[in-house]
Design a protein with these regions (language model features):
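N-terminal binding-site loop/beta-alpha segment at the start of enzyme catalytic domains
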Residues: 139-215, 272, 278
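Beta/alpha (TIM)-barrel catalytic core signal, keyed to glycine-rich beta->alpha loops juxtaposed to Asp/Glu
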Residues: 256-434, 438-447, 451-454, 462-472, ...
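Local cysteine-cluster metal-coordination motifs and their immediate loop/turn environment
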Residues: 431-446, 483-500
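Short Fe-S-cluster ligation motifs
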Residues: 461-490, 516
Length: 516
């Protein structure tokens, strides 16, 4: 009897799912799915090299693992088209009892998670790593419990250049992997982020690389872009295509404010969201909001069906007369609506604070990073179930995960320290920009407004004798963009600013510093 026939005979044992024959060595395994294969690869990899293997069910994922382990010949009682194509591509000898188109999950309701994992992978070694990551993540999900409060905001992704579309996909992949492996699962994107590229990044770095059950995905309907009711369906369909999904876990009407709420009413955007939910195309719907607590109260009163609200909340804006974080949060609590927090670090402003403010933090908790104070402040508020952080590199991600994996709210002393730091920052005269970049869309002079405001704020912190390194960065930016002094005062930017900043006046401040 040859080796593959011996493997087939062993597979007929009661409960056997996998058998391996390599010379005189024979092994039988009983785990379902690809677990037996990954276990062998981890504990006894040499057993597979040159082996003959029989398996109850062989899909592309199992085929990739067998090839990665160096299996010589495979028999599958049931084998998928993807497995056959994979074996033929790599020249692995195979045979089967029954051939099927594809493998579903154990409920028969969706594709097998492991098959989804390797769908776009052609390298067996890469496939092995991906399968093992997915196994770990699914094991975490199976443990249950509440969703962890840190959300991956896809608004400030790492870049390879100053071009907002020039995304560093390799670094984003690493960030997504680490985020999921640490038990986090919420990803937030939007139609216009990164100049309409963010949703595509979600598809390439998340959706194509992980089974759908590994993550929660949120995106937003750009109500400010609507010209008619029919636009809503067109945009939603395009979002599904860009993200590569059949449904969204959370869907938001984006940036409701006094200027755009009439369009929401005219086109009945909430009814559209209800329709999508009834069709199973979204799981939950709500809205993000940048305006007064009075308008928020009105919207929640008129649309009690909204399941959650996304608010800008951070310790600098908590008592702000413009943003009114505290008052808006209180309105959400009055209506018993769960809250998602955006801008907890205020676009990076609260990640780098003046030295005396940082000293206050260090005196109380020298082990905690400056941004951690801002995120913990927001995450500790009643009713907050998610805090979004627009992380731009792996280091920021790792820092955030370090204190959010086992979240602990601020204590009384820490809250007092935050209040003191807020006062110090306000005393510097920093511009309250969050770098959302909504203002840059229609600037006739191509002025990178958020970048200039960031340089201005850093200059306030670092500047000595009227000079700082930010002058060099300003000069570099002006080589390809309009200067702050090029502003023609058209005001197109100010109508789009969620912070209600007087951008035209502030650009004069910027030019006064960097162009004087």
């Amino acid at each position: 009897m040859n080796a593959i026939d011996r493997a087939r005979r062993l597979l007929s044992s009661d409960g056997a799912t996998l058998s391996v024959v390599n010379g005189k060595r024979e092994r039988i395994y009983y785990d379902r799915g690809v677990k037996s294969l990954t276990d062998v690869l981890d504990s006894n990899r040499a057993l597979l090299g040159g082996a003959s293997v029989a398996d109850k069910l062989v899909g592309k994922a199992a085929a990739m693992l067998m090839i990665s382990g160096g299996v010589a010949e495979v028999y599958g009682e049931v084998m998928s088209d993807g497995a056959v194509e994979t074996f033929e591509k790599f020249g692995t000898k195979y045979s089967f009892g029954t051939r099927i188109q594809g493998i579903t999950n154990r409920d028969g309701t969706a594709p097998c998670p492991m098959e989804q994992t390797v769908k776009y992978i052609d390298d067996p070694a890469v496939a092995e790593e991906a399968i093992k990551r997915t196994q770990k993540i699914l094991k975490l999900r199976a443990q249950g419990g509440k969703m962890k409060k840190l959300g991956f905001g896809m608004m400030r992704l790492p870049l390879l250049s100053s071009d907002q579309k020039d995304i560093d996909f390799e670094q984003v992949n690493k960030m997504v992997d680490e985020f999921l492996l640490h038990g986090f699962e919420y990803f937030d994107t939007a139609w216009m982020y990164h100049e309409h590229t963010s949703e595509i990044v979600a598809r390439e770095c998340l959706v194509k690389r992980y089974p759908r059950e590994c993550f929660k995905l949120a995106t937003k309907l750009p109500v400010f872009s609507l010209t008619c009711a029919e636009d809503m369906q067109k945009i939603f369909d395009e979002q599904c295509k860009k993200c590569g999904v059949e449904y969204f876990d959370y869907y938001l009407l984006h940036n409701l404010n006094k200027g755009d709420y009439p369009a929401v009413q005219e086109y009945d955007a909430f009814a559209f969201a209800r329709k999508l939910k009834a069709e199973g195309k979204i799981k939950h719907y709500g809205f993000s909001f940048h305006d007064t607590p009075q308008l928020l109260d009105r919207i929640l009163t008129e649309h009690p069906d909204a399941e959650f609200v996304q608010l800008q909340i951070n310790y600098l804006d908590w008592e702000s007369e413009g943003v009114q974080s505290k008052n808006c949060w209180e309105v959400a609590r009055k209506h018993n609506k769960p809250v998602i927090v955006m801008e907890p670090v205020k676009g990076g402003t609260l990640a780098k604070v003046p030295a005396d403010a940082e000293g206050l933090f260090r005196a109380v908790r020298p082990d905690m990073s400056v941004p951690s104070w801002a995120i913990r402040f927001a995450a500790g508020l009643d009713g907050v179930f998610m805090v979004l952080s627009g992380m731009s590199n792996l280091e920021q991600l790792e820092d955030n995960m370090s204190f959010m994996e086992r979240f602990r709210p601020l204590n009384a002393e820490e809250r007092l320290t935050v209040n003191k730091v807020s006062g110090v920052i306000k005393g510097t005269g920093a511009i309250a920009c969050t770098a959302c970049r909504y203002c840059t869309e229609n600037c006739p002079k191509n002025i990178p407004i958020p970048d200039y405001f960031s340089l201005y704020n850093l200059h306030l912190i670092e500047g000595k004798n009227g000079w700082s390194s930010q002058f060099n960065y300003y000069e570099a930016l002006t080589a390809d963009h309009g200067k702050a002094s090029d502003c023609v005062k058209c005001g197109a930017c100010e109508g789009h600013c969620p912070q209600h900043l007087k951008i035209r006046d502030l650009l004069e401040k910027v030019s006064g510093v960097f162009e004087s």
